[in-house]
């Protein structure tokens, strides 16, 4: 029956299989997309596509906000109607006064007449008089201004508030969609997209889209309305003059468009460079122990800086273009003034078509239109930047995953037996299409049996497991479960049937209980406890202060390998899976734990299909069927005995391994007494008794970061990720006081020459506004001069001055733009570099702190440095500009009427109050915003960095829910911010109109009662109010300024921190003849963040130069901790670590580490070539290729590398993802060999290797150990038997030491471990 199902399934899907080459299609898709990107690098997201996530509520908010922005935009041109009429009233009044001062003239019956009886020809031009009461006229105009002020207050508030709220809602949705889409992507997509880049896009790029669709939209609508209404009013009042003025508008438009296009292009390049820098930072911070051990800090800073240099270049180019075209636009505007007043005055004086008031109305309305067009350019910049950022975001959102893990499609079988079959499967990884991993693989895995896959590293064993989980689809052939092609099955359902335990298990930064519950959402606490007992994890968990509520730290990195492995096994067992995949699952366990786990596996085997990839014979022998792999093909199949008889691949592996186990020779076993043999049977036979036997004080302190809080109540209900994070008092970013500007400026000292030049330009630009007010009032004053020739002469002089101002502006605006772009980019680069350098210089304990997780640190690097520009970049130009503006305006105003100046100055406190409120409020929000997004960054980083584990246990939805809950915090903050920012903006806008209202009212009084000339009223009011507007504009930058001070404070806090162990500290002892003698003298140690748990409890052991010391003991007894003390990742609390008789605390850190090489159990490789990874072993000099090849040959790596298409130039992928574990381990060994260290540390260095590789690498390591002091940590006894000293550890102390023979003769803990696998206690 089963066979017919298989045949039917093959026939059905075989027809489709010809074209069902998923990964080929993936590669073609990828290639074509890369070609498209090359062809159309300029392709951008359409503007309205930015709003694709808007709901009907958002559309309503944006509509009302736009309507209010439109009404607000009408207000400015509307005021000009009042202003023009008021100008005519002033001029008429002044003309009347001047005429009445002529001897012989008087006002009779509201007409100016000659008082003598002889009629004169001039009487025909008699002027009306006595009708103007200037004070009552001014009261009327003041009330108009006040009414407009109220309207502006209401509309200004609504436009900003509604648009910011609508944007916050859309951005929240966008972040959710983006993360959801990423979590749906197939694993092959992650092979081609780095996690660091995705994190940068999630934080930085979406923020840029937010900037484009929030308040900038409201301001753009307002300004464009003012532009259009201004031009319409100009045409309505006088088309001739309007046409002349707007004849230069196309040039202004060209300038604005050039700014938009250039900024978009340069921003895109800048973003790409920063994203690459983000990838480097993420990779390095995640691998900090490796970087520190190999002294790679300087090299990594240089690698990071290279990417920053590219970003800096594009930023400076952007500043040059911005500066030049801003100057160009201003130059055109001043030339416009000159042309308008020159031509307009002829229409007033010669042709009498316009009144002076009409001229002012036309001129100002068109200029207001043009100025608003100019002011809209920053909005265009934000839109262009947002569209550039949206390109990659929307591309990802729109991409359909080839294997969609959340798809509802596919069959869900009622029953599953667990029969798995590979039919002619050929496969290569999407990122390395030229390397074939599986080659026509055919194999059957029977249900309810344990099948072991054996073979050399890189033969395709782990790849086969990934195909079963459907991380990838075969390029050819198919994989079936119970006769069904797995491509026809529902993915989530399929993965729910599978439990997976990997060699390098990933735990999530939550509690142990929650990590186990990840296996099954509805698991009760009893289920969790039972699973922990089955995985032999219960005892060490109960020894921890918070037991199951213990937080495991980032990636579970605070636990020993064995502890992590057992929690991962518990997580797999709690699923009760029909198919259990064990990829080197017990390699990190000691003999005792492995025996326990094997017993559990044999118990659950009935009704479960177990596939085990393993190198240990003890694991393989227990299997019902063993399949031998070679070159991506299954070459043999059978039981242990059958395959030994066949003398093929398996026989070779067994022979090699048994040769290595000479320690366990017959003599040793014979020496074991009958009691010992009984104990062995007893400990293996009775599970409960063996559990009791294994109760001991394990090292609780491998968890070097645990938060102190009362234990959670144990509950039997579904606990979500978010609740767990909320209940645990995980420390948030500590509060920092905003950095003082003086400190920021002091830090910016190298950029001062540029800032000085930029400030000179900004100061000159600042004088332009009050000088404009002076010249403008001068022109208005000329219209009341009786002599027309005098009028003409003065107007021409003023027009020439406008031309001169335009030319100066062109130069100074360019100067300001370029100089501050240069200083800002240099500062940002330096801040990023110094910040990154300071991070790499911190002690390892600092990275153990949850607040300094890789996600949080990379997010901080990505956003903080660029925000500091807000306090030291173009913002200084804005401050200098505003200061000069106000100073010159005050001088002009007080020179002509100190009384009126004082009245207007009464409104300055309100302006200052508005700005101060904005600054204070937004400083708070900037801080809270950052904290919330850092927490979001931690979730995304954790999910994406461990995507294989997340996909394997089918917890994509759980991370999505966690992220969506966390996103509520920045959303709520944004809503609060919208209301405050809206009110402050509206208040700052309306205060101008109120100031005008009061000023003109009082000005009327001064003209009427004190004889002040009306042009002085215009001069004083224009100068002060325009300078106040500039001040208001400076205040509008308070959000970025506030964020800048908070970000700068974080940087300074980091730069000021003096780590207790600093790699940058040049002090400390160094000596020439480094021998490698090591003495641990009564070392006591607790991890800094967990002072309640003692890890080492008086460790004392000595190693002479050239000797090998092997540490033996149960998982978590402090073996790896001793290595970390030797590397000076930490210092002992009491006692000493002596190196050649020198106290390690007094030895120079760099010098010490340069003499130590390390190979860890989970090797960390960097996303660069194999050659560069090997060269990383010695960062003090350039390593010649000969040395690289020699090291590779010693590590048995050279032949494998030469079989790759790109040989030593082959990129290993993110975290070495393109290589098998054995291959990665051999690269790590070659890296240690190339270092040529005096001390070699091997922490489970061969646990990841198959038997064949282990044998060859062991030979290499034996060679590498010659002439070197060596410390070995291993669970395989064959690895340690030849050590000069074997130190048996328990509870942080050495309980026995000696050679293998001496310890066997003592018949103590070591003897018991070798003969029975019993626990060390």
UniProtKB/Swiss-Prot annotation:
ATP 2 binds at residues 1113-1120. Residues 84-147, 237-240, 341-353, 777-794, 1001-1011 are extracellular. The chain crosses the membrane at residues 63-83, 148-168, 216-236, 241-261, 320-340, 354-374, 756-776, 795-815, 870-890, 891-911, 980-1000, 1012-1032. N-glycosylated. Ubiquitinated; short-chain ubiquitination regulates cell-Surface expression of ABCB11. Residues 62-385, 755-1043 form the ABC transmembrane type-1 domain. Changing residue 591 to S: In a patient with intrahepatic cholestasis of pregnancy; impairs taurocholate transport activity; does not affect protein expression; does not affect cell surface protein expression; does not affect cell membrane localization. One of its GO terms (biological process) is fatty acid metabolic process. Changing residue 931 to P: In PFIC2; uncertain significance. Catalyzes the transport of the major hydrophobic bile salts, such as taurine and glycine-conjugated cholic acid across the canalicular membrane of hepatocytes in an ATP-dependent manner, therefore participates in hepatic bile acid homeostasis and consequently to lipid homeostasis through regulation of biliary lipid secretion in a bile salts dependent manner. Transports taurine-conjugated bile salts more rapidly than glycine-conjugated bile salts. This is Bile salt export pump.
């Amino acid at each position: 029956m089963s066979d017919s199902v298989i045949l039917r399934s093959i026939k059905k899907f075989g027809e489709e299989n010809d074209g069902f080459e998923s990964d080929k299609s993936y590669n073609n898709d990828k290639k074509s997309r890369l070609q498209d990107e090359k062809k159309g690098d300029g392709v951008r997201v359409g503007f309205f596509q930015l709003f694709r996530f808007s709901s009907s509520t958002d559309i309503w908010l944006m509509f009302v906000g736009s309507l209010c922005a439109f009404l607000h935009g009408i207000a400015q041109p509307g005021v000009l109607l009042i202003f023009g009429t008021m100008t005519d009233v002033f001029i008429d009044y002044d003309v009347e006064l001047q005429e009445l001062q002529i001897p012989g003239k008087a006002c009779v019956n509201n007409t100016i007449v000659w008082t003598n009886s002889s009629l004169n020809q001039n009487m025909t031009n008699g002027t009306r008089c006595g009708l103007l009461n200037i004070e009552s006229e001014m009261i009327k105009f003041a009330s108009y201004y006040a009414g407009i002020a109220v309207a502006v207050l209401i509309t200004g508030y609504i436009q900003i508030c509604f648009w910011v709220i609508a944007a916050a809602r859309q951005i929240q949705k966008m972040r959710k969609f983006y993360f959801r889409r990423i979590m749906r992507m197939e694993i092959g997509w992650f092979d081609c997209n780095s996690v660091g880049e995705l994190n940068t896009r999630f934080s930085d790029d979406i923020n840029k889209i937010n900037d484009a669709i929030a308040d900038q939209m409201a301001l753009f609508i307002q300004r464009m309305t003012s532009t259009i209404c201004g031009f319409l009013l100009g045409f309505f009042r006088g088309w001739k003059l309007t046409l002349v003025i707007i004849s230069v508008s196309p040039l202004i438009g060209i300038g604005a468009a050039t700014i938009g296009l250039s900024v978009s292009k340069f921003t895109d390049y800048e973003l790409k460079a920063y994203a690459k820098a983000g990838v480097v930072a993420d990779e390095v911070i995640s691998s900090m122990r490796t970087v520190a051990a190999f002294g790679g800090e300087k090299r990594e800073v240089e690698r990071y800086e290279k990417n920053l240099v590219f970003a800096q270049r594009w930023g400076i180019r952007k500043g040059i273009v911005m500066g030049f075209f801003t100057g160009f636009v201003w130059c055109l505007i001043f030339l416009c003034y000159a042309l308008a007043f020159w031509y307009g005055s002829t229409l007033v004086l010669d042709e009498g078509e316009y009144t002076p008031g009409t001229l002012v109305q036309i001129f100002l309305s068109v200029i207001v239109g043009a100025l608003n067009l100019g002011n809209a350019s920053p909005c265009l910049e934000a839109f262009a930047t947002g569209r550039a950022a949206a390109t990659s975001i929307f591309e990802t959102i729109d991409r359909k995953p080839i294997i969609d893990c959340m798809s509802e499609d596919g069959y869900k079988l009622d029953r599953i037996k667990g029969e798995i079959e590979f039919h002619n499967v050929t496969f290569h990884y999407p990122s390395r299409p030229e390397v074939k991993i599986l080659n026509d693989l055919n194999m059957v895995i029977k249900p309810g049996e344990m099948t072991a896959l054996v073979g050399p590293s890189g033969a395709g064993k782990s790849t086969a497991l990934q195909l079963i989980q459907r991380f990838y689809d075969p390029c050819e052939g198919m994989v079936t479960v119970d006769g069904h092609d797995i491509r026809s099955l529902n993915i989530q359902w399929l993965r729910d049937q599978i439990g997976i335990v990997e060699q390098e298990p990933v735990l999530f930064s939550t509690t142990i209980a929650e990590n186990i519950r990840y296996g099954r959402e509805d698991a009760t606490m009893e289920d969790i406890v039972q699973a922990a007992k089955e995985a032999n994890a219960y005892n060490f968990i109960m020894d921890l202060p918070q037991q199951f509520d213990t937080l495991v730290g980032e990636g579970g990195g605070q636990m020993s390998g064995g502890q992590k492995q057992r929690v991962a096994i518990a997580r797999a067992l709690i699923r009760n899976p029909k198919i259990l995949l064990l990829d080197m699952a017990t390699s990190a366990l000691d003999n005792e734990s492995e025996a326990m786990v094997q017993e559990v596996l044999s118990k659950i085997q009935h009704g479960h299909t177990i596939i085990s990839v393993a190198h240990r014979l003890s694991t393989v022998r227990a299997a019902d069927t063993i399949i031998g792999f070679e070159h991506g093909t299954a070459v043999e199949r059978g039981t242990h005995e059958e395959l030994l008889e066949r003398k093929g691949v398996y026989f070779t592996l067994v022979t090699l391994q048994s040769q290595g186990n000479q320690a366990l020779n017959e003599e040793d076993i014979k020496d074991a007494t009958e009691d010992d043999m009984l104990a062995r049977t007893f400990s293996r036979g009775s599970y409960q008794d063996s559990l009791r036997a294994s109760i001991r004080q394990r090292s609780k302190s491998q968890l070097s970061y645990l938060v102190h809080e009362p234990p959670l109540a144990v509950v039997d209900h579904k606990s979500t990720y978010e609740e767990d994070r909320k209940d645990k008092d995980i420390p948030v970013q500590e509060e920092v006081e905003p950095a003082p500007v003086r400190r920021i400026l002091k830090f910016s000292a190298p950029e001062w020459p540029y800032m000085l030049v930029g400030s000179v330009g900004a100061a000159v630009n600042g004088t332009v506004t009050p000088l404009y007010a002076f010249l403008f009032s001068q022109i208005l004053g000329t219209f009341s001069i009786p002599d027309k020739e005098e009028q003409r002469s003065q107007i021409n002089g003023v027009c020439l001055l406008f031309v001169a101002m335009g030319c100066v502006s062109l130069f100074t605006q360019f100067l300001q733009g370029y100089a501050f772009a240069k200083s800002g980019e240099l500062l940002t680069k330096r801040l990023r570099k110094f910040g990154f350098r300071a991070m790499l210089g911190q002690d390892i304990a600092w990275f153990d702190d949850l607040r300094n997780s890789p996600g949080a640190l990379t997010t901080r690097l990505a956003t903080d440095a660029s925000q500091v520009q807000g306090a030291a970049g173009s913002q200084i130009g804005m401050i200098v500009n505003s200061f000069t503006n106000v100073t010159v305006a005050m001088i002009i105003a007080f020179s002509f009427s100190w009384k009126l100046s004082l009245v207007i100055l009464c409104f300055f406190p309100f302006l200052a109050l508005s700005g101060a409120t904005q600054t204070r409020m937004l400083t708070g929000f900037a801080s809270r915003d950052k904290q919330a997004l850092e927490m979001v960054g931690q979730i995304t980083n954790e999910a994406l960095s461990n995507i294989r584990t997340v996909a394997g246990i089918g917890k994509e939805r759980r991370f999505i829910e966690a992220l969506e809950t966390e996103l509520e915090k920045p959303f709520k903050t944004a809503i609060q911010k919208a209301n405050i920012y809206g009110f402050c903006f509206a208040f700052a806008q309306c205060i101008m109109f109120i100031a005008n209202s009061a000023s003109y009212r009082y000005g009327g009084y001064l003209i009427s009662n004190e004889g002040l000339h009306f042009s002085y009223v215009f001069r004083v009011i224009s100068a002060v109010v325009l300078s106040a507007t500039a001040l208001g504009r400076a205040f509008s930058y308070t959000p970025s300024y506030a964020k800048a001070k908070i970000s700068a404070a974080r940087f300074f806090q980091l730069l000021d921190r003096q780590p207790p162990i600093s790699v940058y500290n040049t002090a400390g002892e160094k000596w020439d003849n480094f021998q490698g003698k090591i003495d641990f003298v009564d070392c006591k140690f607790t991890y800094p963040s967990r002072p309640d748990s003692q890890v080492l409890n008086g460790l004392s052991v000595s190693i002479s130069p050239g000797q090998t010391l092997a540490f033996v003991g149960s998982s978590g007894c402090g073996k790896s901790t001793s290595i970390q003390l030797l590397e000076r990742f930490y210092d002992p609390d009491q006692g000493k670590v002596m190196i050649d008789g020198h106290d390690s605390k007094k030895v120079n850190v760099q010098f010490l580490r340069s003499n130590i090489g390390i190979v860890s159990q989970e090797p960390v490789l960097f996303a660069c070539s194999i050659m560069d990874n090997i060269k990383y072993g010695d960062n003090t000099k350039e390593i010649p290729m000969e040395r690289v090849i020699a090291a590779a040959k010693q590590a048995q790596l050279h032949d494998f590398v030469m079989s790759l298409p790109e040989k030593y130039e082959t990129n290993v992928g993110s975290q070495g993802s393109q290589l098998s574990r054995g291959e990665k381990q051999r690269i790590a060994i070659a890296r240690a060999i190339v270092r040529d260290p005096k001390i070699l540390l091997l922490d489970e260095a061969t646990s990841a290797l198959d038997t064949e590789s282990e044998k060859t690498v062991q030979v290499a390591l034996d060679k590498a150990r010659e002439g070197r002091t060596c410390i070995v940590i291993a669970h395989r006894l064959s690895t340690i038997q030849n050590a000069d000293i074997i130190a048996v550890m328990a509870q942080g102390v050495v309980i026995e030491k000696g050679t293998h023979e001496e310890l066997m003769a003592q018949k103590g803990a070591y003897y018991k471990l070798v003969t029975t696998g019993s626990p060390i206690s």
